[in-house]
Amino acid sequence: MEQEHDWQYDLDEYIRQGEPDRSEKSAAWQIAIGLQDVDGLQTSEYLLETAKEHIEGKIDISTAQKRIYSYYELRNVRMTDEQDTMEADIVAAHIAELLAEKTFQFSPAELQSIHRRLFTGVYKTAGQFRSYNISKKEWVLNGKTVFYAAFDSIRDTLDYDFSQEKDFSYAELDVAQSIKHIAKFISGIWQIHPFCEGNTRTTAVFMIKYLQTFGFNVSNQVFADNSWYFRNALVRANYNDLQNGIHATTEFLEKFIENLLTGTNHELKNRYMHIEYTESAQSANDSTSKCKNCTLEELAILREISKNPSITQKELAEAIEKSERTIKTRTVELQNNGFLRRKNGKRNGLWEVLVEI
């Protein structure tokens, strides 16, 4: 296990050093590499060395990708194991590029574009909806399968789900309610399984980009350590076997997202999700956020303030990509609700977060 996560230790060093550009690149690479685990794939040492050079600013992301392509062209890959590593390396480099971009459009076309960009050079069908029905045996279901959408209803189903989500307002929801709704939406998109392969990695990148529109910097650690859990949680959110008392549930996915957004420490164990797991005390060590009554926007503000108590409203607006007017309104509300206070005056004072986040 230690050998598998050497890459994580190496990339963590850039975050510990505290340089913003290096930290951001390292976090993207950690998510990109960790996500390969959803399909049991591992990246190569060559990919890690290339990632380090990119993080250190010696090469840009385009050069990093070209190096990966050239590396495998020279090796003339034929063996299945090496083909899997090649896929992991290429897709990881594409994910790192996408996560660094400050662009996003909430639409089925964006989901399709993400798949195309992740898997160009890997699958001939990159960016194309599947043209046949599928089933997949799942470990967490004892070899049974989720029922995926019929291929001829993919586009209509995606259009419907996206239109419903686009019209939905999170404004009056607290964090717990927001997470439950996000889990339901994301698991629904995954259940459609619009592509032949690569659906989970595509869904993960889409979800990260979507969550960033709420002002969140998504935890790289949660995806780096728990990508397979993420997949199994999506499976359990879409599987029913009423005859045997098994119901579809988003509870596991909600725990994952809560850890991702709030720094909560739910114990994310795959065995807890297995349909034959019977122990009742699944997570005695869970630590729960005390800011469940905040909105997602308020939580994003509190997290930025906790990292930098001297942050200005202008800097807050830039950090979570909201207007200064919105920040001013929200900080006043947070102070009135007892979540935040200002010490030592407006000009030279500091913020103090009064709740655990």
Question: What is the meaning of each model-derived region?
Answer:
Residues 1-357:
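FIC/Doc superfamily catalytic core
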